[in-house]
């Protein structure tokens, strides 16, 4: 059983339309997949509307997978994150992901911090290096942190795993899928987690228990 809460479609910079993304996820035995296209002030309404249409149509025919309507707030001014996350939720987004301070992109400093203080943010994606204050906020607001299979972003997976362990943060293994070959099955997800240094118990929580906990919010 596989869960992926961070993927992209042609609605932003991905290669697949929603139907093909979901079909390929079904082949890889996914139980749930979130469509979280890149969003800012200009397009979040359109993304939520389109993704909701896709979800409603697909669930008429495929009842073996849960499609989740989401957005990834990407490279927006850090101070705007809490307000934008609330707007997205109010408009119908089921989860809000924030594009964290990955070391391979010029994400503005304090993005992680402002994501961590928002009650409407669900996942901090590829966060890079997380400081103590941010980690404490993530814990307090019950925000999940991402361990990623995506090349480049995954450079700091080990650091993220250690911070999560130290502060009791909940981790998810996501793909940040943009192309068909980015999706992974459960066995490969296990390798990503073990490679990040997760223990067997932490891996079980990350692959099964924490995803189910997140699904209960939706």
Curated annotation (Swiss-Prot):
Signal peptide: none annotated. Pfam families: PHP. GO terms for molecular function: 5'-3' DNA exonuclease activity; 5'-3' RNA exonuclease activity. This is Uncharacterized protein MJ1295. It comes from Methanocaldococcus jannaschii (strain ATCC 43067 / DSM 2661 / JAL-1 / JCM 10045 / NBRC 100440) (Methanococcus jannaschii).
